[in-house]
């Protein structure tokens, strides 16, 4: 039986069609081994892409770019880096890793990561008749370096504790905990971002007693789960309001005594007739209670307007924290000092101004008294002599 002459040709055609089908089933595509990458601020990140199935991309155009950016992060074309077309913010910070370029694997290494590098990236391969893109996301993280707890001066409501931290990205989670790990409700929480996009957080807590034991400020990064804790233990004396009266009562008594000095001085000088002319008009006004109180309040207001803002919040790391914490005693000392500084200068000025007049008055009064005493003595002698003469006359008549 004779074979057909076209059998070899037919087999070749079938084989060719089979290869075409296989080639179409193995169409090239771009993928990335990791779609989500983590990188710390100041560290480095490696964005990898590869062609599947393995295929040399040495003569392809490889581009990394970001949505919304007109310039690519990195551009590889014709076997060379196209630096002039890359975005300037990535200049001298990128490296093209091409050890496995013959297998279709390439990477872009970014150094000195900053917060602006956070976000999605796209990697594209372009060749005649082939183009494909893979997307990956770079998550940049930063953990704050310092956490401070500030304590406001206690008042009738309790003690306000404030936790401050900065240098975080993305925005961290904050909460107060007690010594048993239970979450405490915060009074206020706020945040801000600086020019470098770092987050700065502030959280406050109002404490009315020390039943919670130690107080812990917890801050955690929502991406990495890293957590930082700072704790404090406040003295029980801060929550004991009885000590207020220990300072307020003696201060009130002493203030009344000091404020009463000038009116008594005024009354004394007037009784002696020392004040005359302008002084007789000014002295009652200057030494009156309303003028003293207004002067004292004005001086106190000016002092506290300058003083209190500088000690409103005190860090536990401040070496003067024990001094600032005893604010009641400190406040009373300042007010007492103001009172003394108000009373003494006026008293001294009055004494200096009125002493010459009073001395003259006192000398005159002294002379009058002596004269009156001398006249009284003569009158007594005359009376005694008269009595003796009367007695002698009566005896003679008898």
Swiss-Prot record:
Signal sequence interval, chain numbering: 1-25
Pfam families membership: C2-set_3, V-set
Tissue: Expressed in skin, thymus, testis and, to a lower extent, bladder, brain, heart, kidney, mammary gland, small intestine and uterus.
Keyword Transmembrane in annotation: yes
Gene Ontology CC annotation, any one: membrane
Subcellular location: Membrane
Glycosylation sites per record: 92, 139
Keyword Repeat: yes
Transmembrane segments annotated in the record for this chain: 245-265, 289-309, 332-352
Side Extracellular, residues: 26-244, 310-331
Family matches, as CDD domains: IgV_MOG_like (cd05713)
Domain Ig-like C1-type: 142-233
Membrane topology: Multi-pass membrane protein
Intrachain S-S bonds: 49-123, 163-217
Residue stretches making up the Ig-like V-type domain: 26-141
Topological region Cytoplasmic: 266-288, 353-398
Main localization (coarse): membrane
Record Gene3D superfamilies: Immunoglobulins
Keywords for this protein: Disulfide bond, Glycoprotein, Immunoglobulin domain, Membrane, Repeat, Signal, Transmembrane, Transmembrane helix
Note: Encoded by one of the 11 copies of Skint genes clustered in the D1 region of the chromosome 4.
Function: May act by engaging a cell surface molecule on immature T-cells in the embryonic thymus.
Entry's family note: Belongs to the SKINT family.
The name this protein goes by in its record: Selection and upkeep of intraepithelial T-cells protein 8
Taxon lineage: Eukaryota, Metazoa, Chordata, Craniata, Vertebrata
């Amino acid at each position: 039986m004779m074979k057909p002459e076209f059998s070899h040709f037919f087999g070749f055609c079938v084989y060719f069609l089979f290869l075409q089908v296989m080639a179409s089933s193995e169409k090239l595509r771009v993928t990335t081994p990791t779609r989500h990458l983590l990188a710390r601020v100041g560290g480095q990140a490696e964005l990898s892409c590869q062609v599947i199935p393995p295929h040399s991309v040495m003569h392809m155009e490889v581009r990394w770019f970001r949505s919304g950016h007109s310039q690519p992060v990195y551009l590889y074309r014709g076997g060379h880096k196209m630096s002039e077309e890359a975005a300037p913010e990535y200049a001298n910070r990128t490296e093209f890793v091409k050890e496995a370029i013959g297998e279709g694997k390439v990477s872009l290494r970014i150094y000195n990561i900053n917060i602006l590098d956070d976000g999605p990236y796209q990697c594209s391969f372009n060749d005649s008749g082939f183009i494909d893109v893979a997307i990956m996301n770079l998550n940049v993280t930063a953990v704050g370096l310092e956490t401070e707890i500030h304590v406001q001066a206690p008042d009738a409501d309790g003690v306000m504790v404030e936790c401050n931290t900065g240098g975080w990205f993305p925005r961290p989670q904050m909460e107060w905990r007690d010594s048993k790990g239970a979450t405490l409700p915060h009074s206020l929480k706020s945040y801000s971002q600086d020019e470098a996009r770092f987050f700065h957080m502030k959280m406050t807590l109002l404490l009315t007693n020390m039943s919670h034991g130690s107080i812990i400020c917890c801050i955690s990064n929502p991406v990495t789960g890293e957590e930082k804790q700072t704790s404090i233990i406040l003295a029980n004396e801060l929550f004991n309001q009885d000590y207020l009266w220990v300072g307020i009562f003696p201060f009130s008594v002493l203030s009344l005594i000091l404020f009463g000095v000038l009116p008594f001085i005024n009354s004394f000088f007037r009784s002696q007739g020392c004040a005359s002319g302008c002084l007789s008009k000014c002295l009652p006004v200057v030494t009156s209670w309303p003028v003293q109180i207004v002067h004292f309040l004005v001086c106190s207001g000016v002092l506290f307007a300058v003083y209190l803002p500088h000690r409103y919040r005190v860090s536990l790391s401040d070496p003067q924290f024990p001094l600032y914490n005893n604010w009641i005693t400190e406040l009373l000392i300042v007010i007492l000092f103001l009172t003394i500084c108000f009373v003494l200068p006026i008293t001294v000025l009055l004494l200096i101004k009125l002493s010459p007049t009073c001395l003259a008055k006192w000398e005159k009064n002294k002379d009058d008294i002596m004269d009156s005493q001398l006249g009284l003595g003569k009158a007594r002698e005359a009376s005694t002599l008269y009595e003796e003469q009367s007695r002698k006359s009566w005896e003679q008549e008898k």
